[in-house]
Each structure stands twice: as C-alpha cells, then as structure tokens.
C-alpha cells in the first residue's frame, strides 16, 4: 500500500514538473511573442502586429507577428535596410531588401537568423528584457 502511494505521488510530481517545463520552454502555439529582446549585435522589439530590429550597421522590420509553433519555431517575412556611416542625406532612399526572419523561442531566449537574398545574418542569441550591445557604423 505504501509503495503504491509513493509511486502515485512520484507520478503526480513528475506530471506537474513536465507541464510547467513545457509552459516555460516554449510559448503557446500561435500566441504572438511580444517585448524587447536584446543581445550582442542585435536589438529586437516585437509587437502583436510585427516588429523592428536594429543591428550594428543595419535595421529592419517584421511585417507580421512572431507566432511560434509548438516547438517554438517561427518564420516571418519582413524587410532589411543596410545602414552606412555618417548622416542620412536629404532625399536619400534607404537600401531595402526583402528578408525572412527565422528563429526559435525557448523561454526568455530567442535565437534569430535573418535571410537576405543568398546571405544569412546571425545567429543572434537574444534575451527578453536584457540590455543590447550594438556597435553602430561610423
């Protein structure tokens, strides 16, 4: 009888730990990820309608919300702008290119790659609420 109680109690604790771990490890399927995500060489701001990103010598925008699947993975179309040193000239048209923002969310960590044509930027490891460390073009 005592053995049966111990096994049941252990199974209950295991189920509780597994359910909490899953809730922390990845967001709910389809729920938009929002907030400030920062790290070395990148700063990402996500909203319920899309987002913006700033890199050392570039910036960009996400045209849709980040809605990870059950595994925490996502792909969002957007735009990428190459920056340059010095001021922006009057009438200057930014150098924009289509981009795919591909990543994975695990708890308070987001890993991001940005695909621009044949070039892949990253991976960037970003943490929710952390400070960013950007080295802007001069």
Labelled PLM ranges:
Residues 40-82:
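N-terminal glycine/threonine-rich, aromatic-flanked beta-hairpin/loop signature
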Residues 20-25, 60-73, 109-138:
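Edge beta-strand at a domain terminus
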Residues 1-3:
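N-terminal secretory signal peptides that target proteins for export/translocation
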Residues 8-19:
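Bacterial N-terminal signal peptides
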Residues 44, 63-67, 92, 97-105, ...:
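Hydrophobic/aromatic beta-strand elements that line small-molecule binding cavities or substrate pockets
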Residues 76-102:
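An anionic, turn-rich surface loop/hairpin at beta-sheet edges
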Residues 27-43, 133-135:
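Tryptophan-anchored aromatic micro-motifs
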Residues 31, 38, 47, 60, ...:
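Residues that act as N-cap/strand-start positions at coil-to-secondary-structure junctions
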């Amino acid at each position: 009888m005592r053995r049966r109680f111990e096994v049941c109690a252990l199974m209950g604790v295991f189920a509780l730990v597994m359910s909490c771990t899953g809730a922390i490890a990845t967001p709910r399927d389809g729920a938009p990820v929002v907030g400030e995500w920062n790290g070395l060489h990148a700063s990402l701001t996500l909203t319920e309608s899309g987002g913006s990103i700033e890199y050392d010598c570039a910036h960009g925008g996400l045209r849709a919300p980040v809605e990870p699947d059950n595994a925490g993975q996502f792909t969002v179309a957007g735009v990428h702008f190459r920056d340059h040193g010095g001021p922006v000239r009057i009438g200057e048209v930014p150098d924009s290119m289509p981009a795919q923002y591909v990543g994975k969310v695990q708890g308070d960590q987001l890993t991001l790659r940005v695909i621009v044509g044949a070039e892949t930027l990253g991976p960037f490891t970003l943490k929710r609420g952390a400070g960013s460390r950007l080295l802007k073009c001069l």
